[in-house]
Amino acid sequence: MSKTISLLKFIICILISLCSFTYAEKIRDLTSIEGIRDNQLIGYGLIVGLDGTGDQSTQTPFTNQSLHNMLSQLGVTIPPDTNMHLKNVAAVIVTANLPPFSHTGEAIDVVVSSMGDAKSLKGGTLLMTPLRGADNQIYAIAQGNILVSEKNNLKKNNSIFSNQVNSGRINHGATIEREINTDFGKKKIINLQLNKEDFGIAQKISDMINVQYPDTATALNSKTVQLNTYANNTIQVHMLSNIQNIDISMPSQEAKVIINPRTGSIVINQEVKLGTCIVSHGDLSILIEKKEEEKINSFLFETLRKNQKESFLKNIINRNYINNNSVKNTSLNNIVRVLNSLGTKPNELISILQLMKNAGCLHAKLEIV
């Protein structure tokens, strides 16, 4: 009997936690440490060994020029008037990210992208390419065989898509030759930068840190929490390892609807609320109303001819309409689902949402990307 009661208590606790409107995230998922970041590297190089899919020399003269320079550095002399027609060489841009606290000799991944009119980089080998930082210093050397996705034609919605074969990757293709010096552990001040500005979350982070480390954290603004610690590597590492694992209870998210007009994609979060309004668009009319007697939201959706709109709107004003199509769960998701089921085009759907926002019944931030 006691085991059954304990099991019921456990299930109730789980249900309560699932029904909660708040959730917790660790500080490491909400912030980054100022000054500790990746550094971008870039270089120009040549790929050889292509199966006739390289640059056309007449269209990309810089490929031949680069090949001449490389061969001369290797001690190979080519007459200046020689016009080489090579189809197995391509000029490329090589990019990589140098992680923080990287050491000499470590390997990092690189991305290789064609500069000219090469048809494919498949089967090619990148020759030794220096990678430079923003200060024009060489931080890594890249070389190796390129991994390119297989070219498959995919048919979707009567359109044919092909995998990109003019770029590829080299896993562990660059070796770090120079380290980036940081001032970590040399200053008493550490700034935590929030991934998304929010005064409430910044203050919560500061308060929770001060519980574990009193008088340490201060919320400077909606984006920065400042830590006052000791200028010592060991102390700061130990302190940050503990701070980053502190749980922060998160408030409700900002109500937001994100729309991509090019693809017709719509993303809606659970905080979006609807108010009472009427939206008329083309042959579609939407009534969204809160029914006080049932203490719930419901909406009536009807498709009308143009000559029926006037009588429909009059009936709505006088509350003399038939509520046989009402849906009790008045979420924006349901309205979008019903509109989609009736064959509403994406641009019409986006226009309706914008009208609902303008009418004041869509209580959310409408973001068009």
From Swiss-Prot:
Gene Ontology MF terms: structural molecule activity
Lineage: Bacteria, Pseudomonadati, Pseudomonadota, Gammaproteobacteria, Enterobacterales
Function (record text): Assembles around the rod to form the L-ring and probably protects the motor/basal body from shearing forces during rotation.
GO biological process terms held by the UniProt record: bacterial-type flagellum-dependent cell motility
Disulfide bridges in this chain: none
Database matches in PANTHER family: FLAGELLAR P-RING PERIPLASMIC PROTEIN FLGI, FLAGELLAR P-RING PROTEIN
Organism field: Buchnera aphidicola subsp. Schizaphis graminum (strain Sg)
Predominant location category: other
GO annotation, cellular component aspect: bacterial-type flagellum basal body, distal rod, P ring; outer membrane-bounded periplasmic space
Annotated HAMAP family: FlgI
Protein name: Flagellar P-ring protein
Alphabetized UniProt keyword annotations: Bacterial flagellum, Signal
Record's subcellular location: Bacterial flagellum basal body
Taxonomic superkingdom: Bacteria
Subunit structure and binding partners: The basal body constitutes a major portion of the flagellar organelle and consists of four rings (L,P,S, and M) mounted on a central rod.
Family note: Belongs to the FlgI family.
Signal peptide positions on this chain: 1-24
